[in-house]
């Protein structure tokens, strides 16, 4: 007898130390957190507030902002205050490079306003200054009781560490490849920095690690190694993933494999937006990834067939698109009005081949007639055929049935 493989869910989540960032819990047994980052000039308070709010409304639970100079640091408390006046309580993460120690020490209001600090051990300082400047940031994090993310990036890797590992490797009888040494340097940089932060007084539940590279296979290897060697909460992301379809595919493959292995506590899909493009797209992709893998439910799922020669009409495509658009548009209200509606499954199918079957598997579904079929559209609710629609108003009638079903199933009154 042939072997039948069974995999009903991803592997058990790696048990990590939970970290509180503002009012969001990262790691432990908490749901995987979606986060994003602004691309505005942080010193431009109006633009940054608008983008942070847009990212949060799209579903980003944490939003990172660049703090690269004194004007940006001075703007941070104003940004938080403005957001709170607008009703947005959003944990802001400060992204620091090169002079983070100065910005945090000279702008205590900035240090207080941020919910977390991101530090890159590869550029926190150089030579004799590195240890002192890293220590300054950790001392400030301890003082204000803020968590940190030690974010290693192979584009700004600690060259002293890398050189040492390469020299040691050269002395081995069977030396590792350059790629293996690079990956080991990324892992060691993150772990050594985290242990050092603990020695300086930062608690284990105040530390999140990330180790970003731009190659899919390297990213999988780095995070798999990191997950084996520690229990810190892990932030997943493929750096410089790129634009459009390529960026989405690369990030989804890399993060999807790691998530399937139980690795990852918070994710960011780093997409390069087109000029004037929508920054919130990366948030939606992250949500879609977690939802299709079964980790979280953010919005109802609309199943629709791709179409073929049996579906020369575009009616089912138009209906599927309209329903999906309407569902997403209404979710901000429906989450409060109809608790659990994000688990809804709707099927809009184009012909008799798979239409009835897929519609039965959905909570509510419709099988529209294909080319040459009888102009009738059976509707199924929770596996049972409840009605057959005919005529020129099939789409409108199905939308009414869908609305009634949502109200009946998820309404609280």
Swiss-Prot record:
- Organism, by scientific name, is Bartonella henselae (strain ATCC 49882 / DSM 28221 / CCUG 30454 / Houston 1) (Rochalimaea henselae)
Query: Cofactor note from UniProt?
Result: Binds 1 [4Fe-4S] cluster.
Q: Which family does it belong to?
A: Belongs to the IspG family.
Molecular function (GO) terms listed? Answer: 4 iron, 4 sulfur cluster binding; 4-hydroxy-3-methylbut-2-en-1-yl diphosphate synthase activity (ferredoxin); 4-hydroxy-3-methylbut-2-enyl-diphosphate synthase activity (flavodoxin); iron ion binding
Gene3D superfamilies the UniProt entry points to: Dihydropteroate synthase-like (3.20.20.20), Sulfite Reductase Hemoprotein, domain 1 (3.30.413.10)
In its keyword annotation, does this UniProt entry include Cell membrane?
no
Metabolic or biological pathway: Isoprenoid biosynthesis; isopentenyl diphosphate biosynthesis via DXP pathway; isopentenyl diphosphate from 1-deoxy-D-xylulose 5-phosphate: step 5/6
EC number, UniProt record = 1.17.7.3
Pfam families listed in its UniProt record: GcpE (PF04551)
User: Can you tell me which residues bind [4Fe-4S] cluster?
Assistant: 305, 308, 351, 358
The keyword RNA-binding belongs to this UniProt entry's keyword annotation: no
| Function text | Converts 2C-methyl-D-erythritol 2,4-cyclodiphosphate (ME-2,4cPP) into 1-hydroxy-2-methyl-2-(E)-butenyl 4-diphosphate.
* GO term, biological process aspect, one: terpenoid biosynthetic process
Keywords (A to Z) from UniProt: 4Fe-4S, Iron, Iron-sulfur, Isoprene biosynthesis, Metal-binding, Oxidoreductase
Instruction: State the reactions this protein catalyses.
Output: (2E)-4-hydroxy-3-methylbut-2-enyl diphosphate + oxidized [flavodoxin] + H2O + 2 H(+) = 2-C-methyl-D-erythritol 2,4-cyclic diphosphate + reduced [flavodoxin]
Q: Which InterPro entries match?
A: Dihydropteroate_synth-like_sf, IspG_bac, IspG_bac-typ, NO2/SO3_Rdtase_4Fe4S_sf
Protein name, as recorded: 4-hydroxy-3-methylbut-2-en-1-yl diphosphate synthase (flavodoxin)
| Cofactors, names only | [4Fe-4S] cluster
List the PANTHER family hit by this protein, alphabetically: 4-HYDROXY-3-METHYLBUT-2-EN-1-YL DIPHOSPHATE SYNTHASE, 4-HYDROXY-3-METHYLBUT-2-EN-1-YL DIPHOSPHATE SYNTHASE (FERREDOXIN), CHLOROPLASTIC
């Amino acid at each position: 007898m042939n072997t039948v493989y069974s995999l009903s869910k991803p592997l058990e989540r790696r048990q990590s130390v939970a970290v509180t960032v503002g009012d969001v819990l990262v790691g432990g047994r908490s749901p995987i957190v979606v986060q994003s980052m602004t691309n505005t000039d942080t010193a431009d308070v109006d633009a940054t507030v608008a983008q942070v709010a847009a990212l949060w409304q799209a579903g980003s639970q944490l939003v990172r902002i660049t703090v690269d100079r004194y004007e940006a640091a001075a703007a941070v408390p104003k940004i938080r205050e403005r957001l709170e006046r607008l009703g947005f309580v959003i944990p802001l993460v400060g992204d620091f490079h090169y002079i983070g120690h100065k910005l945090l020490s000279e702008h205590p209001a900035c240090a207080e306003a941020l919910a977390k600090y991101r530090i890159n051990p590869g550029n926190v300082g150089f030579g004799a200054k590195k240890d002192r400047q890293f220590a300054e940031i950790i001392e400030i994090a301890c003082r204000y009781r803020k968590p940190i993310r030690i974010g290693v990036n192979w584009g700004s890797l600690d060259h002293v560490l890398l050189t040492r590992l390469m020299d040691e490797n050269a002395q081995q009888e069977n030396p590792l490849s350059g790629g293996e040494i690079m990956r080991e340097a990324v892992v060691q940089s993150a772990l050594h920095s985290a242990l050092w932060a603990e020695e300086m007084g930062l608690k284990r539940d105040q530390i999140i690690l990330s180790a970003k590279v731009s190659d899919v296979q390297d990213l999988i290897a780095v995070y798999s190694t990191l997950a084996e060697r520690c229990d810190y909460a892990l932030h997943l992301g493929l750096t410089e993933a790129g634009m459009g379809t390529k960026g989405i595919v690369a990030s989804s493959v890399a993060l999807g494999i790691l998530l399937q292995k139980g690795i990852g506590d918070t994710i960011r899909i780093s997409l390069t937006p087109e000029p004037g493009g929508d920054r919130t797209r990366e948030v939606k992709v992250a949500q879609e990834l977690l939802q299709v893998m079964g980790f979280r439910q953010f919005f109802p799922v609309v199943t629709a067939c791709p179409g073929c020669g049996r579906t020369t009409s575009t009616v089912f495509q138009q209906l599927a698109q309209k329903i999906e658009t309407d569902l997403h548009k209404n979710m901000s209200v429906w989450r409060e009005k109809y608790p659990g509606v994000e688990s809804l499954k709707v099927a809009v199918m184009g012909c008799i081949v798979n239409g009835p079957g897929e519609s039965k598997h959905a909570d509510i579904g419709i099988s529209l007639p294909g080319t040459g079929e009888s102009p009738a559209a059976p509707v199924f609710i929770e596996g049972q055929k409840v009605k057959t629609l005919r005529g020129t108003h099939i789409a409108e009638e199905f939308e009414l049935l869908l609305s009634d079903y949502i109200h009946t199933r998820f309404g609280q009154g």
